[in-house]
């Protein structure tokens, strides 16, 4: 029987700063390593990161850092953790490329050789558990959920996600994989719950693209679009709408 601990170091009752520690016997699995940008009352502070004390004290037990996607709330604090611990970092191709840029900006070039690109078909076996992945829908490509499988059952960490059957292939959820995970037995579900209290269903990506295209076609003059820079899905929709309506983007 495995001794299992699940310790949230960030991301609980707050949006951002995601970091879960899953400890199975003597092995520590770090799930995400994000930061959060401060509210207005924290003037002069650029970002808030998790307290790494527990991980630093047990740094020799860390078998890997696993990233769900390439947004700051999931990987923005990674360079600060790597200044204190040395562990393999796993993520999809885009996530690792963004993590590499972030690490280089902090002068952590020596850690990059310990960055590994994975996809949802990869399964990594450790002494105390097996780590696997499943594809999720988010606003950035290459988003994954993480499964830590133990002899007591699986610990499933979703990362940021939504369900949208109209999403394109590179953003689509692997529902078949989710079914397999559920049938195998889940010990604990660590789920994104942002806006879970909102009963209104979010608009599908397909409708957003159609609405943008309609606006572009019907307006005679210039159209100015504002978007969060990290919402790559929305930026791609903007390009699709411009192409379909014969507009040029400046």
Name the predicted role of every residue range.
Residues 1-66, 71-250:
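His/Asp/Glu-rich metal-coordinating catalytic cores
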